[in-house]
């Protein structure tokens, strides 16, 4: 009787455990990780929501490049909503607490949003490459840009479709640490390739990493390197030399610098995590805990940086951010924000007047 009672108490205790890992049970470690993900979630969601609002609410901001930036912001919002909360909670608890229906849906949406962001960066780089290399040819239209964006979503959706097909709730003793989780109705959400062979699953995972990071990085490296060589080493073919065209060329250069910064941040944020995923089989579990969360957090934090880059390096986005902030009642009373907004608005009006005068002077006068 006593033995049965002891076994029952032990089983009850196992079911109440959040996870068997002593590191993940440490309150300071949990607090640090949850704080990191909470900051990423708030900053990324607010920043990218501002970007979406600025582009959609302001007709002058509805350019081809900004349409791509809008799509990039939407992808980052999805990453923020789907990757950060679900992944962080399930990893810290070491089981999937959200039910069987959400398991494949969330896993597919996570992969989709990451691929959309990567492919959108590629689309922007190709657009800039064509503008610089063939400046006399007409730019792609806004309608054609929407077709490209739709194609990005379609290709990304097809690419990650197997991840949804093979994602299910499973019990893995190597991850959960004990088979008692199965009896306690605690599972992990993961891709299960036992029906087709685990070697095919490993191959698909490597192909995904190649398509999500390696190929986009190579394309971005080629396009922006070529653009840099043309801008800083040669005069752009067909580029006029009057002040109006020089100002336009300067604006192009600023936009390209901004997008190069976005690409560099993307590469820096995702490279360590992808390297970790390649060598994860050769890393012990105790070390993996300390490596995974900082590097996964770095990759997820990529969604935070783009709005900051836009605000810092683009006057229109910066003014748009300030206008949105001024529309918030509690911030409207802040004199410093109000003064900055007035200064930037005045500068923008002065620039428009100068540009109008230059265009007027460049027009031929009638005899």
From Swiss-Prot:
Where's it mainly located? membrane
What InterPro entries does the record tag this protein with? GPCR_Rhodpsn (IPR000276), GPCR_Rhodpsn_7TM (IPR017452), NPY_rcpt (IPR000611)
Query: Where is carbohydrate linked to this protein?
Result: 4, 8, 21, 107
Q: The organism sits in which domain of life?
A: Eukaryota
| Recorded GO MF terms | neuropeptide Y receptor activity
Question: Where can this protein be found?
Answer: Cell membrane
Q: Which residues lie on this side of the membrane: Extracellular?
A: 1-35, 88-113, 165-212, 280-282
Topological domain, Cytoplasmic: which ranges?
Answer: 57-66, 135-143, 234-258, 304-367
Q: Which UniProt keywords apply?
A: Cell membrane, G-protein coupled receptor, Glycoprotein, Membrane, Receptor, Transducer, Transmembrane, Transmembrane helix
Topology in the lipid bilayer? Multi-pass membrane protein
Q: Does the keyword RNA-binding apply?
A: no
Q: Provide a GO CC annotation, any one.
A: plasma membrane
Instruction: Give the residue spans that cross the bilayer.
Output: 36-56, 67-87, 114-134, 144-164, 213-233, 259-279, 283-303
**Which residues belong to the signal peptide in this entry?**
none
Check the record and name the Pfam families matching this protein.
7tm_1
Similarity annotation: Belongs to the G-protein coupled receptor 1 family.
Function noted in UniProt: Receptor for the neuropeptides RYamide-1 and RYamide-2. The activity of this receptor is mediated by G proteins which activate a phosphatidyl-inositol-calcium second messenger system. RYamide-2 is the most potent activator.
Q: What is this protein called?
A: RYamide receptor
Q: Which gene encodes it?
A: RYa-R
